[in-house]
Design a protein with these regions (language model features):
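Extended recognition/assembly regions associated with phosphoester-bond processing machinery
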Residues: 2-25, 70, 78-86, 226, ...
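Acidic (Asp/Glu)-rich catalytic clusters
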Residues: 20-27, 127-131, 154-159, 184-189
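Short, well-ordered coil/turn segments that N-cap beta-strands
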Residues: 25-29, 83-85, 134-137, 160-163, ...
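Histidine/acidic-residue-rich catalytic or RNA/ligand-binding cores of hydrolases
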Residues: 41-43, 97-106, 148-156, 174-181, ...
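C-terminal helical cap
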Residues: 144-146, 164-182, 231-254
Length: 258
């Protein structure tokens, strides 16, 4: 797409950097990475090149692929520190689970199933290198709700670069949103979340989804007021944050005109 010849791992990263610059020039502020697992590892340049050439020659094993993908996530994080694009990570979907559907109709026909996902160990190399870098910002999503309070909330509460994305896909629902707030907020707080964003291709559903998210957040905030955990002025401030301010801050959108 950019006319470059990609014959090496270094050339691949350079080509991706070029595409990132192109999208940024059109107003993009974030990248999005879909992986089966959020495994990260920093490889020596010669090892990354060896795995790249094995893949080009059709000789790469499943472990080779796993290690190279882990290295590329590290490279994408590095590029984010250079170009300022927010790094989004959507792990944990086993794509095309139904082999018969895949063979007849091809990929991405609705047979994508969540799998258990481990973040704490898998992201440690990336977060040790970039988690406290003020140039870096990462938004984490999950399909494994068991990780909300055990892993994601503590990670976001510790690393300044992390924000937790809203409930995603199967959990983008009334009960999914309720579970998210209950499991995340006590440890991660409110201001370590990304507010409610929307990456759906179902364009006409966007207003309804935002309406549902705002109603669910209002219900949750109202519950905090009813239990005398916060006051009304604090509730109004939180409502503004979760609906508008956190998203604009997370994705580095220009400030709104007064």
């Amino acid at each position: 797409m950019n006319g470059a010849t990609i014959g090496s791992s270094e050339a691949l990263v350079a080509a991706l950097a070029g595409r990132r610059r192109y999208f940024a020039s059109l107003g993009a502020t974030a990248t999005d990475h879909g992986v089966l697992e959020p495994y990260t590892a920093e490889l020596a340049p010669e090892e990354a090149e060896r795995l790249f050439q094995k893949a080009r020659n059709g000789e790469a094993t499943a472990d080779d692929q796993r290690r190279y993908e882990a290295h590329m996530l590290m490279e994408m994080a590095r590029l984010s520190t250079e170009d300022g694009l927010v790094m989004q990570l959507h792990p944990g979907s086993l794509r095309d689970h139904n082999s018969a559907v895949w063979q007849r109709f091809g990929p991405d026909k609705g047979a994508d199933i969540p799998v258990a996902t481990e973040f704490t160990r898998n992201l440690r190399p990336l977060l040790n290198k970039y988690g406290t870098d003020p140039r870096f910002s990462m938004v984490l999503f999950t399909l494994d709700e068991s990780t909300y309070s055990r892993e994601l909330a503590p990670l976001a509460g510790h690393y300044p670069a992390l924000r937790l994305g809203p409930p995603w896909w199967f959990h983008d629902s009334i009960e999914g949103m309720r579970r998210y707030r209950e499991q995340v907020s006590e440890t991660a707080g409110i201001y370590n979340t990304a507010g409610f964003n929307d990456d759906t291709r179902a364009f006409c559903s966007i207003p309804a989804r935002h309406d549902l998210a705002r109603r669910m957040d209002a219900n949750w905030i109202g519950g905090l007021v009813a239990r005398h955990i916060i006051e009304m002025d604090e509730a109004r401030e939180i409502a503004q944050a979760v609906t508008v301010d956190l998203v604009r801050e997370t994705y580095r959108f220009p400030a709104m005109e007064a």
